[in-house]
UniProtKB/Swiss-Prot annotation:
Protein name (database record): Large ribosomal subunit protein uL5
Assembly description: Part of the 50S ribosomal subunit; part of the 5S rRNA/L5/L18/L25 subcomplex. Contacts the 5S rRNA and the P site tRNA. Forms a bridge to the 30S subunit in the 70S ribosome.
Family: Belongs to the universal ribosomal protein uL5 family.
Lineage of source species: Bacteria, Bacillati, Bacillota, Clostridia, Natranaerobiales
Coiled-coil region list: none
This protein's encoding gene: rplE
Length: 179
């Protein structure tokens, strides 16, 4: 079982129940899913860039990504409907906890000049988003194997009703918020 999942079930869940004043343990917010997305604008010119991004994302998450396609044509970006423009992975269950554990304890501390993640990136419904400027912070990726430094968006969806509940949950799980 994932270390972070054990920590959640053993320590975080009971403490949050007492702290928030819930009557039932099932009311305590939990992680629902983690979506990792890489938007690759240059995929239209060079399909090899997209293949590398898919490979990198698979190494980082342990799951094969889905190639995302443009929903509509945009002439200014020279993109036609149906063209591949990125890739994403939706993680749930044990893989989600493994990835989040690795993100919090390994990847984020390796970010240059890291002072914590913004506490303002909640969406109003208990979900949190953060962006990484480069994929090199993950230990699975070797510097020599990377053809192009690529950023990624990470969305953490929770069952929390409010941003405050979600923030308390993520803080208890070890998310390093700044300020």
């Amino acid at each position: 079982m994932a270390r972070l999942l054990e920590h959640y079930r053993g320590e975080v869940k009971p403490k949050l129940k007492d702290e928030m004043g819930y009557k039932n343990i099932m009311e305590v917010p939990k992680l629902e899913k983690v979506v990792v997305n890489m938007g690759i604008g240059d995929a239209k010119d060079n399909p090899k860039i997209l293949d590398n991004a898919v490979e990198n994302l698979e190494q980082v998450t342990g799951q094969k990504p889905v190639v995302t396609k443009a929903k509509r044509s945009i002439a200014n970006f020279k993109v036609r409907q149906g063209m591949p423009v990125g890739c994403k992975v939706t993680l749930r269950g044990e893989r989600m906890y493994h990835f989040l554990d690795k993100l919090i304890n390994v990847a984020l501390p390796r970010v240059r000049d890291f002072k914590g993640v913004s506490p303002k990136a909640f969406d109003g419904r208990g979900n949190y988003s953060l962006g990484l400027k480069e994929q090199m912070v993950f230990p699975e990726l070797e510097y020599d194997d990377i053809e192009r430094v690529q950023g990624m968006d990470i969305i953490i969806a929770t069952t929390a009703e409010t941003d405050e509940e979600a923030k308390k949950l993520l803080e208890r799980l070890g998310m390093p918020f700044s300020g």
